Amino acid sequence: MALSFREFHLFQILNGFSQENKRFPLDRYLSHYFRRHRAVGSKDRRMIADTVYDLIRWRAPLDHFSIYPPTWESRYFVYSQTAWRERAQAASLPPHIALSFPQSYYSFLVAALGREKAEEFCALSNESAPTVVRVNGLKTTRENLLKSWERLYPVSPTSHSPWGIRFHKKVNFFAMKEFKEGLFEIQDEGSQLLADLMEVEPGDQVLDYCSGSGGKTLAFACRMQKRGQIYLHDKRKEILAEAKKRLRRAGVQNAQLLCYDDPKKGQLKHTMDWVLVDLPCSGSGTLRRNPDMKWKFQREELEQLLAEQRNIFKEALTFLKPKGKIVYGTCSVFPQENEDQAAYFQKHLSLSLERLFQTFPLHEGMDGFFGARLTF
């Protein structure tokens, strides 16, 4: 059977993404795909992206109702039958299938969170994530952007972050003049609040140890008013190249990039006023944006992650000066990666806890983030 234009790109995305590195985020993959395929218009992009997310989110019941071996084509065949949701609701399905989670992941969540909270979490993880941006305080104010946008888009200020604006419909942000001018960045409200644990001041020396492309640095940089120095450290040179573009667009001038093998690192030991360690984690708090992660979950890998998190934190701690402050962060809801790790750092590294921060995915609310601010 011949495929429609949308179906062709749908299967190109699904099959191509399935072959990518298992830690490559779905939202980033979609953005890159559509940038490479300019012929896909905005309406088609929305429809294709929504279908991609639905097929990945609801993989378990789609496979359950299919009479064919599990493929993206067989799942799409069931998905195209409008009554599949009603069938799923009417059938007495095992809870992990009804909630569309691997049985091992569902069982782990029940053990970690309790059955009621685990099932609430699973249901919320199958919803669409809210669309939130963070205003760049180096270039404008939230009031100015709200005033400019409210005539064009359904927008509202976020309830908790003083820098956030929520969009109530999908928008191609990358095409907006304000984005190209660096007036805002796309960032979940919970991520903005995690960055607020970094109460940096002008003149401080700051290290973002697992910086990625610099999202958290961009969030706290305006506090420094272009005075002091921020170091963005990551082991991936290509992601630091992306950080360089974002810093330039945002007008952050007091930042340097450090790859893991940079010889300058040794000179920075015990000199930082602030260190942020936004660690590699399970990503369980962001499954609405990256539902593929639930199908890749393995308990053995989580155990390896916990050990890796402790090792990275210990490395980052060597850059903190006496009386400096270090912020540990994840985008996870698992206590093993959050409260348990913070307790380990206090017990074994002679640190004192100053502040804990946590968000849990809520209906139309923030993603799941955790942060702990500690000091000697």
Which residue ranges define each predicted feature?
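S-adenosylmethionine
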Residues: 1-376
